[in-house]
Amino acid sequence: GFVGAGIGAALAGMRPIVEIMTVNFSLLALDQIMNNAATIPHMSGGQFAVPLVIRMATGAGRQLAAQHSHSLEGWYAHIPGLRILAPATVED
């Protein structure tokens, strides 16, 4: 999928940005996010970096109904090796 392609591009020296439409769809790529993007730097002893940005919408809004309004950023924050960024103000 897109996340796997992004991981491969990152390992090849690029700095890809992968967009996932909503955070709930990121669960389909969870294996790649958790077991590859987040762990390859640690498993390689720092020899490999995965400079990948995964951008996704989270929370209610955008008229996407209940199935697409999850807020999983707190859950992702508990995965070692991931950094979670979220705007705090309108200016952000």
PLM region descriptions:
Residues I7-D92:
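Conserved thiamine diphosphate
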Residues G1-A5:
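Short glycine/serine/threonine-rich phosphate/pyrophosphate-binding segments
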